[in-house]
């Protein structure tokens, strides 16, 4: 039964083969793939698989059987061997890719053996009968675009990988229209060469570029353009490539440069959408390259399989017998033995017209694409956007740009904006228990609060990202690459920078800044000097040494003048006549103001204690009055200053200004290694700052620090031998943090501001700027600063421990007063002892007593107040007989009480 069934099938196949011109059920096709074409090979396999598994028998009455070889184009023998291998297998047509090294070998074999080659590679310059070019030519579209932009001076960057067809067309047009074109071959350029070239072109004010390179080299050129910051507003790039959406242009979106290009594949057509659904389901391990959308070369590969399948269907309908290709033979035979049906195959291929992924696929007599349409795209803030199209009939047709409704941030409302910042207290810090939080909740600080307020005003979602290298942003002098937060913006890794980022000219050239949210200047930080210990006689500090000397001389002078006027004025003399019935002179001295009483009067008035005597004459009272007025002013001034001098412990700073730093050598000083402060000194033309920059640049060890925290730590550990130059806001903040051992000295060296940064030309720029202005008007920015600088300060308003401790007096503040008191008491006792001994000696001589007996009598008198047997007080110095009566008036400060003596 099985044998009968097989015979029936064979018989039916034979009749079917006779009816259809003996067309084979399995069609052998070749595939030649070069390096870095994994995705194209995946598209090739997928197209064959979908054809062979098509449920429509009329669409796929035969199977395509591929024979694939991977070739190394640098080895011409390997290319020849691969082609001959395909030929010996009896393939009817070959799908293959080539480069400039293998194109001539493959096209020569195809022409000699009449084997058709369907290729998505760049179009050949000559006429190759058996080569079908799937890739359309860009010449017409590019020239139309240049005419539209009216470019007459631009740079044309090209390589020779794709030949010289576009270069030749541009140079011919330039000659006709008088264009000035700088054509530069970049085939052998490396990264450094690219950057040097771009810098040179920038010096020549070249802002317009046409780039005609294959995708790998093109991507590298674009990266170097970004690295040197030439992807910002003012630059315009036309990319001569058919896969505008295949190119990574995210960084150009943030930069703001105008980028124009061409797109062959329309991802909105039903056929492409259907294929994309199938493409996404491919196993990435089995189908390499399927993790990304198909490139235009992959779409051309897919269309190439469709062209071959349609060709074989057409041959089948025409009943052309291709079942026997003849003797495969040796492809290197001399003379060559071409395939007899090769002409039919080539003719049918060129007659094919299908709708593929790349639109209408049709060829002319030379195997080149005709009647195709390519879209023109421009890079907008929202990404690539179609602005027109080009075809052979209509040429360049531009679509009127539809204005974007809503605010500038409408395009980003549905995604999260990356906000780059730097870990710097008090701007951005980790919370104490940050491990318990995720995302933005891990951080706190001034800039964290500011970011939240800005996001509320412009209505966006954001994610805080700490800059990896911990730098603010500077441009490397050698590589021309930006680092830090500026680099994050320039190279498209972030969209907003909210940090203590200084607004400078060099930064403004590559990024945009908002209005300043904080004003500041460069200041000097030093280690806080030890507070000077108050001197023993610190109570003398309120008045200068010269004033004290003048007071002493004034005191002596006033006393002498008072003595003299009292001597010369008759009203100071008190000579009185004896009363009636009394004899002898009065006990009252003739003049009270002797030299010692004058000194005593002046001292009492100066001490504001007064005296028992006072001038009676007008001249004496004038002297006393002016002396009292003088002492009133001096004592009041002294008292007013005394409190401040006793309660404030002064610090003597070795540095008070930048000039002090520049003219000394003991104290080193430096800045952050990357930032605006260093740039300020590097560019300054002021002599003092130039001198400081010369020192900092050549100092060993280096005085530049990687972070602000490192600089502060160096100040604290240097024992006063290192000064750190940084922004005044940070200086003031650190001064308020424990251990409270740093201080700001002198004024600010310049005036500048911190701004919120966005990429050049970003749609966020205007919205962020308005948000900062709105926050500033009600004083919210000042409120935020007070919150993080002073409300959370740890050193008090004066930078010390607290107000109470600062105003409290210690013993050292008034020790001198106690010393004077003790000294005065000691001096008084010493004088009393001298007087005691002197009087005892005089008493011994007068009373004919020994000195020791006189001492004992005086001591007994001093202790008991009596030396007599019955307790009477003996006063040997008093007169023996005194008139009885009432107490005699005081004279010369001595009062004597007279009483009846026995």
From Swiss-Prot:
Palmitoylated. Depalmitoylated upon L-glutamate stimulation. ZDHHC3/GODZ specifically palmitoylates Cys-611, which leads to Golgi retention and decreased cell surface expression. In contrast, Cys-837 palmitoylation does not affect cell surface expression but regulates stimulation-dependent endocytosis. Disulfide bonds join 84-331, 740-795. Pfam families: ANF_receptor, Lig_chan, Lig_chan-Glu_bd. Residues 1-20 form the signal peptide. It catalyses: Ca(2+)(in) = Ca(2+)(out); Na(+)(in) = Na(+)(out); Mg(2+)(in) = Mg(2+)(out). The chain crosses the membrane at residues 545-565, 618-638, 814-834. Residues 22-544, 639-813 are extracellular. A lipid is attached at residues 611, 837 (S-palmitoyl cysteine). Residues 593-608, 609-611 dip into the membrane without crossing it. Homotetramer or heterotetramer of pore-forming glutamate receptor subunits. Tetramers may be formed by the dimerization of dimers. Interacts with EPB41L1 via its C-terminus. Isoform 3 interacts with PICK1. Found in a complex with GRIA1, GRIA2, GRIA3, CNIH2, CNIH3, CACNG2, CACNG3, CACNG4, CACNG5, CACNG7 and CACNG8. Interacts with CACNG5 and PRKCG. Found in a complex with GRIA1, GRIA2, GRIA3, DLG4, CACNG8 and CNIH2. Ionotropic glutamate receptor that functions as a ligand-gated cation channel, gated by L-glutamate and glutamatergic agonists such as alpha-amino-3-hydroxy-5-methyl-4-isoxazolepropionic acid (AMPA), quisqualic acid, and kainic acid. L-glutamate acts as an excitatory neurotransmitter at many synapses in the central nervous system and plays an important role in fast excitatory synaptic transmission. This is Glutamate receptor 4.
């Amino acid at each position: 039964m099985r044998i009968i069934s097989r015979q029936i099938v064979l018989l039916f196949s034979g009749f079917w083969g006779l009816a259809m011109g003996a067309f084979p059920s399995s069609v052998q096709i070749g595939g030649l793939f070069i390096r870095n074409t994994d995705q194209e090979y995946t598209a090739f396999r997928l197209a064959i698989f979908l054809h062979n598994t098509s449920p429509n028998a009329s669409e796929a009455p035969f199977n395509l059987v591929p024979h694939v070889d991977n070739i190394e184009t640098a080895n011409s023998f390997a290319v020849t061997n691969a082609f001959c291998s395909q030929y010996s297998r009896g393939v009817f047509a070959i799908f293959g890719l080539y480069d400039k090294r293998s194109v001539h070998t493959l096209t020569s074999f195809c022409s000699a053996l009449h084997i058709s080659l369907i290729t998505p590679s760049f179009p050949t310059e000559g006429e190759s009968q058996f080569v079908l070019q799937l890739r359309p030519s860009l010449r017409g579209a590019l020239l139309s675009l240049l005419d539209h932009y009216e470019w007459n001076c631009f740079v044309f960057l090209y390589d020779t990988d794709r030949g010289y067809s576009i270069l030749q067309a541009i140079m011919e047009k330039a000659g006709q229209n008088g264009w000035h074109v700088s054509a530069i071959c970049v085939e052998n350029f490396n990264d450094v060469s690219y950057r040097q070239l771009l810098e040179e072109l920038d010096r020549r004010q070249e802002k317009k570029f046409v780039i005609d390179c294959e995708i790998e080299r093109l991507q590298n050129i674009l990266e170097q353009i970004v690295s040197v910051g030439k992807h910002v507003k003012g630059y315009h790039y036309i990319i001569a490539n058919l896969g505008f959406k295949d190119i990574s242009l995210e960084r150009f979106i943030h930069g703001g440069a105008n980028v124009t290009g061409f797109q062959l594949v329309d991802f909105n057509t039903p056929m492409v959408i259907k294929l994309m659904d199938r493409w996404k389901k491919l196993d990435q391990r089995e189908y390499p390259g399927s993790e990304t959308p198909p490139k235009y070369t992959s779409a051309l590969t897919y269309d190439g399989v469709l062209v071959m399948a349609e060709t074989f269907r057409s041959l089948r309908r025409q009943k052309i017998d291709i079942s026997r290709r003849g003797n495969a033979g040796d492809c290197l035979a001399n003379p060559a033995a071409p395939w007899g049906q090769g002409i039919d195959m080539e003719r049918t291929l060129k007659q094919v017209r299908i709708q593929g992924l790349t639109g209408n696929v049709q060829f002319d007599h030379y195997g080149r694409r005709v009647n195709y349409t390519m879209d023109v795209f421009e890079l907008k803030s929202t990404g690539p956007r179609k602005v027109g199209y080009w075809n052979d009939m209509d040429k360049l047709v531009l679509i009127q740009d539809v204005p974007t409704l809503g605010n500038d941030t409408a395009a980003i409302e549905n995604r999260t904006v990356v906000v780059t910042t730097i870990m710097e207290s008090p701007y951005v810090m980790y919370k104490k228990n940050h491990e318990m939080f995720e995302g933005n909740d891990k951080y706190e600080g001034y800039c964290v609060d500011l970011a939240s307020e800005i996001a509320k005003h412009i209505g966006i979602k954001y994610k805080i990202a700490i800059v990896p290298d911990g730098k603010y942003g500077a441009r490397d002098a050698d590589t021309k690459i930006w680092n830090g937060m500026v680099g994050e913006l320039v190279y498209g890794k972030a969209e907003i920078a909210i940090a203590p980022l200084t607004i400078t000219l060099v930064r403004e050239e590559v990024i945009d800044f908002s209005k300043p949210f904080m004003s500041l200047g460069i200041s000097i930080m030093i280690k806080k000097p030890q507070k000077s210990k108050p001197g023993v006689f610190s109570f003398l500090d309120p008045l200068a040494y010269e004033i004290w000397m003048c007071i002493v001389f004034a005191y002596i002078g006033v006393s002498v003048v008072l003595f003299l006027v009292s001597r010369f004025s008759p009203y100071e003399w008190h000579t009185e006549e004896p009363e009636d019935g009394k004899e002898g002179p009065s006990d009252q001295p003739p003049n009270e103001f002797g030299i010692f009483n004058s000194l005593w009067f002046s001292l009492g008035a100066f001490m504001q204690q007064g005296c028992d005597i006072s001038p009676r004459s007008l001249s004496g009272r004038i002297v006393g009055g002016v002396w009292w007025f003088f002492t009133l002013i001096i004592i009041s001034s002294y008292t007013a200053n005394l409190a401040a001098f006793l309660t404030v412990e002064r610090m003597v700073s070795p540095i008070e200004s930048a000039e002090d730093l520049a003219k000394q050598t003991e104290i080193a000083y430096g800045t952050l290694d990357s930032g605006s402060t260093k740039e300020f000194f590097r560019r300054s033309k002021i002599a003092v700052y130039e001198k400081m920059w010369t020192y900092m640049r050549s100092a060993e060890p280096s005085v530049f620090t990687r972070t602000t925290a490192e600089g502060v730590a160096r100040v604290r550990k240097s024992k006063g031998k290192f000064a750190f130059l940084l922004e005044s806001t940070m200086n003031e903040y650190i001064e308020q943090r424990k251990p409270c051992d740093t201080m700001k000295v002198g004024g600010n060296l310049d005036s500048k501001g911190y701004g919120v940064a966005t990429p050049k030309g970003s749609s966020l720029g205007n919205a962020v700027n308005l948000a900062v202005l709105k926050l500033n008007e009600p004083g919210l920015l000042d409120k935020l600063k007070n919150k993080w600088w002073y409300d959370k300060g740890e050193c008090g308003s004066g930078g010390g421990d607290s107000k109470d401790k600062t105003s409290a007096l210690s013993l050292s503040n008034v020790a001198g007063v106690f010393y004077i008191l003790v000294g005065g008491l000691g001096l008084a006792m010493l004088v009393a002892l001298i007087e005691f001994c002197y009087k005892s000696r005089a008493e011994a001589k007068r009373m004919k007593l020994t000195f020791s007996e006189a001492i004992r009598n005086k001591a007994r008198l001093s202790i008991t107040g009596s030396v007599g047997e019955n307790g009477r007080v003996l006063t040997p110095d008093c007169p023996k007989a005194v008139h009885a009566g009432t107490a005699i008036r005081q004279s010369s400060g001595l009062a004597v009480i007279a009483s009846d003596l026995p």
